[in-house]
Amino acid sequence: MYKLILVTLDGTACDRALIEHVKLLAKQAQSRLVLLHVADGWAARIYGADAVSPEITEDTAYLRRVQAEFNGAGIPAEIQLAYGSPPEEILKAAEALKCDLIAMAGHGHRLFGDIFHGSTITQVRHRTLIPLLLVRAKKE
C-alpha cells in the first residue's frame, strides 16, 4: 500500500516520535523511504543548493544518521536535502517522487509564525491529495 514514504524531518527532538512510527509502518508495508529535510536558513534561501554553511553541513550529517538508523533496521532509505520554504519543498518532493504517503511530526504551535504564515503541516495538508501521517511529538 505504501511503497514510497516521504518522511519530513526538521532535525529537532520532535523527529523521534515520527521515526519510531515510520519504522513500524515501513517494516509492515515493506516500504522504501525518502528522508527529507528542508534547509530554510538565510544561506539556503539565498543560495539554494550552492549554499555552504554550518547549518547545511549539520543537516546533511543528521539525515545520514537517520538514514543509517533505518538501513540498520532493514528499511531502505535515501536522503534528500531541499532548500527554501518547507511547505513548498515538501509538496514538490512528494509529487516529483510520486510518494504514497507523507509522514510529518507536529510540534504544536509557534504563535507568531503560525499567525503570519500558517504551520507547515497546515499548508501541506490543504494543498496535497497524497495521504498524510501526522505524528504528535511527545512533550519532554
Task: Please report, for each region that a protein language model flagged, where it lies by residue.
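Short, hinge-like loop/turn segments at secondary-structure boundaries
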Residues: 51-54, 96-98, 120-122
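Structural beta-alpha unit
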Residues: 68-102, 139-140
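Intrinsically disordered or low-complexity boundary/linker segments at protein termini
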Residues: 1-17, 126-140
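Short, surface-exposed alpha-helical segments at coil->helix boundaries
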Residues: 52-64
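Glycine-rich, Arg-bearing micro-motifs that act as flexible, cationic patches
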Residues: 105-126
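Short secondary-structure boundary segments
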Residues: 37-38, 105-107, 136-137
